Amino acid sequence: MGNKKLLTGGSSKTHGSGSSYRDPLLQNQEDKPKANGSENGLNDLEHGVVEAANVGFGRVFALAKPDAGKLVIGTIALLIGSTTNLLVPKFGGMIIDIVSRDVKTPEQQTESLIAVRNAVVIILLIVVIGSICTALRAWLFNSASERVVARLRKDLFRHLMHQEIAFYDVTKTGELLSRLSEDTQIIKNAATTNLSEALRNVTTALIGVGFMFTSSWKLTLLALVVVPVISVAVKQFGRYLRELSHTTQAAAAVAASIAEESFGAVRTVRSFAKESYMVSQYSKKVDETLKLGLKQAVLVGLFFGGLNAAFTLSVITVVSYGAYLTIYGSMTVGALTSFILYSLTVGSSVSSLSSLYTTAMKAAGASRRVFQILDRVSSMSSSGDKCPVGNPDGDVELNDVWFAYPSRPSHMILKGISLRLTPGSKVALVGPSGGGKTTIANLIERFYDPLKGKILLNGVSLMEISHQYLHKQISIVSQEPILFNCSVEENIAYGFDGEASFTDIENAAKMANAHEFIEAFPDKYNTVVGERGLRLSGGQKQRIAIARALLTNPSVLLLDEATSALDAESEYLVQDAMDSLMAGRTVLVIAHRLSTVKTADCVAVISDGEVAEKGTHDELLSLNGIYTNLVKRQLQSSSSVTTL
């Protein structure tokens, strides 16, 4: 309704309504203790960012701690499998030495054939044992990885659900979805599957080097000359890649956020013919991600190309020197063959470790983003445990309440609001748009805490009341209610504590004037309403939301009337349902209808965060002030006198 929106309040401190006024609370904001657990305090709410966490791999691997027993068994299987794989070159070299002998007599030939057969049998046994251990290792580590990602996603989602509303004011939904899906998947691979492969390659490399020493210590030392150089290169490469990966994932999250927003607002996009614009915006962010990805690809390509060149030159050098030793009798052909096989196996393992290190650095970037949320402490405590005894009669009091949204701390919305809602009373909030009407409702619902002052329910501060108890006593019905993508029955029963009977659900729907249109659906109460209730009209969503509030039977009702978006019939049905909902309850209504204001016990006009006028409808008209002007303006803009 533009500047015709209204709000109620109580007595307030009067400091004037000029825009130049700056309240004294703002002077002390920097001195207030910061409730947020991050180093930047509430800075992440003001700027939309949280300081990235420094996450060691020990913390990532700790995610698999509940599966430690299975991973130990998997590690034992891994060690056995790695050892068996390295025994094959040893017996292969023995076969080469056997067939290289100078065999002259039939007895020697028979002896050689028996020796070869025995070696082949041993190799087959080694392969069978190694295959069984490899299968066992893969099963245990992969099953553990699935449990790791499930636990991580549950923990992350649980933590997100307990963040304060202000956190969601500044955080994009697409970014959170990216952390829940993509980042957790990367961490899953690092914590288990990649760990398995890393252990296998490390074990293979160490055991392989041991066998290389038994074959020729001279060749082994020559082969290990390149290791220090490669180690330094890998460390520097990994450090740079970790930062680049973190930046790439952040850019991808922005693109995901644009996509999520576009899908959620597809009707708005279509109504303005902005499909091409949204595609362009998404493409720009994808191109930014692509640019970073291509930079990463070039870096990885150069690194692995150099690594391959170093290994290849090392192998050529070792083989050349090995041939020299063989020619001069210091090694047998079989020993040289075994050594070459060992060196190739070790080289392959080290090369795989480099690849795994690259993946691990990407996981480190993802881990920073995930643990950044897991380490974040909500700036609002929900640890109150009081449940006021006696009749929950809905006595609400705002006492000298000051408030500024955490995302805009320099802009004070409420300036010393004091307001009393006596049990069973109906208080209408009216006033110019932006005055603070919705903010008052948000504070009573405890979506935010005031900077100064108190809000009491039945004489107890909201901050001391149990989170569950508070929201069973207070219910809110907004202009644009949000429904969940489930059945009508499930949506109505959503706020009910326990298992709601179908009879109770049906009665609530009847009181909300929703039963008739629900019964007209082919699936009746089993009808799925779609995401955010998009398959229903505005009036239908309103009435289901009213039925949901009726079923919870709150003692305090916060109501934001919605009339401008409804046709006359829907408006009548919704208003009639609201009248049923308000009966016998303490009601705070952000009023848009003249009929609502007339029947209110108290009307409060909120202007510039203060209560400018307060009284009944007739009392305020007699003042010839802001309220009178609002009524006159509405009457001039419409031939109907039913709305305000």
Swiss-Prot record:
Residues 396-633 form the ABC transporter domain. CDD domains: ABC_6TM_AtABCB27_like, ABC_MTABC3_MDL1_MDL2. InterPro entries: AAA+_ATPase (IPR003593), ABC1_TM_dom (IPR011527), ABC1_TM_sf (IPR036640), ABC_transporter-like_ATP-bd (IPR003439), ABC_transporter-like_CS (IPR017871), P-loop_NTPase (IPR027417), Type_1_exporter (IPR039421). Expressed in the vascular tissue of roots, leaves, stems and flowers, in the distal portion of the root tip, in leaf hyathodes and in anther filaments, pistils and flower receptacles. Residues 8-20 have a biased composition (Low complexity). GO terms for molecular function: ABC-type transporter activity; ATP binding; ATP hydrolysis activity. The keyword rRNA-binding does not apply. One of its GO terms (cellular component) is vacuole. Its main location: membrane. Residues 71-362 form the ABC transmembrane type-1 domain. Gene3D superfamilies: ABC transporter type 1, transmembrane domain, P-loop containing nucleotide triphosphate hydrolases. Belongs to the ABC transporter superfamily. ABCB family. Multidrug resistance exporter (TC 3.A.1.201) subfamily. This is ABC transporter B family member 27. It comes from Arabidopsis thaliana (Mouse-ear cress). The gene is ABCB27.
